[in-house]
Structures are given as C-alpha cells and as structure tokens.
UniProtKB/Swiss-Prot annotation:
Catalytic activity field: L-aspartate 4-semialdehyde + pyruvate = (2S,4S)-4-hydroxy-2,3,4,5-tetrahydrodipicolinate + H2O + H(+)
Protein name in UniProt: 4-hydroxy-tetrahydrodipicolinate synthase
Site (Part of a proton relay during catalysis): 41, 103
Enzyme class (EC, first level): lyase
Primary location group: cytoplasm
PANTHER family noted in UniProt: 4-HYDROXY-2-OXOGLUTARATE ALDOLASE, MITOCHONDRIAL, DIHYDRODIPICOLINATE SYNTHASE
Active site annotation, chain numbering: 129 (proton donor/acceptor), 157 (schiff-base intermediate with substrate)
Gene: dapA
Source species taxonomy: Bacteria, Pseudomonadati, Chlamydiota, Chlamydiia, Chlamydiales
Subcellular location: Cytoplasm
Record pathway: Amino-acid biosynthesis; L-lysine biosynthesis via DAP pathway; (S)-tetrahydrodipicolinate from L-aspartate: step 3/4
Keyword Zinc: no
GO molecular function: 4-hydroxy-tetrahydrodipicolinate synthase activity
Family (UniProt): Belongs to the DapA family.
Matching Gene3D superfamilies: Aldolase class I (3.20.20.70)
Length: 290
C-alpha cells in the first residue's frame, strides 16, 4: 500500500465524534484504494478518551472497508500503549502506528525496550513513528538495527524532515518499508528509498494524492503540493486540513478539541483559491492517468 491517509477525527458542535462524517471520509479513501491511519496526531488521539477511541475503531471496522485500517498507538505510557494494542486486536484492524515515547526523550536502550515491549504483544504489522518534533527525540538508527529481525516490525513513518535520515534507515534495514510522513517531501524521500506516503492532504484530495504518489517527479505536481503543504503548515496539524474539509463539505464542521482551535487559522480567504488550483490540476491528471 503506497498511500495511507492520516485521517482526521470529525467532531459535532457538542464535541462528540461525528460518525456520519467519519463514514464519508473513510469511503472516499476506499474509493481510491488508499489505506487509512486512525487516531494518529492528525486524528487528535490525545484529546479522546479510550472509550471514544474504541468506538471509532469499532465503527470503522463495521464499515467492512476493502482497504487497510492502521490504528495509532499512544506514546504516553507503556501500560496505556500495551493495553490499547491488546484492546484493538479484538477488532479486525490491519496494523499499528506506534509513536515514539513523547516528552521523556529516552536513550537508545530505553527506546529499544519501549518498542520491543509493544511489538511483543501485537500480532499485526507495526509501523514505528519517527516524529522528533513531538516526541523530543528521533528513532535512533541503533533502535532500527536492534529491532530489524522482529517479525512484526514492518516499517517506519518518517516525519523527521531529514532526507539523510530516511536514507540511513533504508541502509540499516533494506527490507523495511519507509513511509514519508511529510506530503511535501515525498519526491525527495522516494528517491532515498521511501516506498509510500502517509498523507494529511489526502483527507481532502484522496484521488489527487494517489496520483501524486504514483507520479512524484512531475514538477507541476510537486509545486502545487508544496504550496498546499505550506498552507497547512501555517498552523498546528490538523487545524488547516479540518478547515479545508469543512469548506469543501467533506466534513460537517471544522471543530477541534482544545488545546487546538480553529481560531488559530488566520487566512481562510485562500481556501477557494487552493480548491480551484487543485481542481484544475485534477482535470489535467484525469487526462494523464486515463
């Protein structure tokens, strides 16, 4: 699976999960053959209770989607992460995205033991999540090397922003599946060995993102994608993408849970401009890919 969408979690005005919008989003990904990642940072996982998260996983599984469903595993405590993995394995999910421990900044041995402890209780393929901007430390090369023989260590989502680190991961473990975790870096990371993209923008443009992944070296594609990335990065993810989804009526409301707020999005006037640009690009892609 080359493209996985880091799915948002839509909310109603009372801050309950908007399951109708969830269904709409997931079916839009299924239509294009894109897998989904639930309850990552884009899905505001830290703002949801365990009960809410389980309801979301159960609902997604009830839709009988013909695409992979990957579930995020929190990096807050080993007990919480282990209990969550055990709970999710009672549902027909396809794998896990395991976050590097946040805030504590462990050393190499602590990080190895953290991931190994979680991998040892799963019976699904797992993608380790390198996100130093949130975790405070990267996934070390020594960690990748030490875990490379684990049967459920499937890949890494690399959101570290370093092309060199992506190349190093592939050198340390050539059989590992590296997923680019930054929409704008897909062409460069693909050249360095990344085999897939875990995308935020594909929430709003699942078909266009699919084409972007298939044709990463088209200059026009990458320029537009970088413009979109620049826009969504003006605020903390997923503020911008929720605003875009609501503008396009892909979700009912642009509501986030605190401490995230839609009020931190300053430039909503650019929304129709970006939508029009993407519409024009989509028409060009339609001619190329058909």
């Amino acid at each position: 699976m080359k493209l996985l969408t880091a799915s948002v979690t839509p909310f109603l005005p009372n801050y309950d999960i908007d399951f109708l919008s969830v269904e709409k989003l997931l079916h839009s990904q299924e239509k294009e053959g894109n897998g989904v990642v639930l309850l990552g940072s884009t899905g505001e996982s830290l703002a949801l209770t365990v009960q809410e998260k389980e309801k979301l996983v159960a609902y997604a599984c009830s839709l009988d989607l013909k695409i992979p469903i990957i579930v995020g595993v929190p990096g807050t405590s080993l007990h919480e992460a282990s209990a969550w993995v055990s709970l999710c394995q009672s549902y027909p999910v396809d794998g896990f995205l395991i976050t590097s421990p946040i805030y504590t900044k462990p050393g190499i041995q602590g990080q190895i033991l953290w991931f190994e402890s979680i991998l040892n209780i799963t019976n699904k393929p797992a993608i380790l999540y390198n996100i130093p901007s949130r975790a405070g430390s990267p996934i070390y090369l020594e960690t990748v090397r030490a875990l490379s023989g684990h049967p459920f260590f499937y890949g890494i989502k690399d959101s570290g922003g370093s092309i060199d680190r992506c190349r190093e991961y592939t050198q340390v473990c050539p059989n590992l599946i590296i997923y680019c975790g930054d929409d704008g870096l897909w062409p460069q990371m693909h050249q360095c060995g990344a085999r897939g993209l875990i995308s935020v923008l594909s929430n709003s443009w699942p078909k266009e993102a699919h084409n972007y992944v298939e044709d990463p070296f088209n200059k026009n594609n990458s320029l537009l994608w970088c413009e979109l990335v620049s826009w969504i990065n003006q605020t903390t993810n997923p503020i911008s993408i929720k605003a875009m989804l609501a503008y396009k009526q892909d979700i009912a409301y642009d509501i986030l849970r605190l401490p995230l707020s839609i009020k931190d999005l300053q430039n909503k006037k650019v929304l129709p401009v970006l939508v029009e640009k993407m519409s024009q690009w989509s028409q060009i892609c339609e001619c190329v890919f058909t």
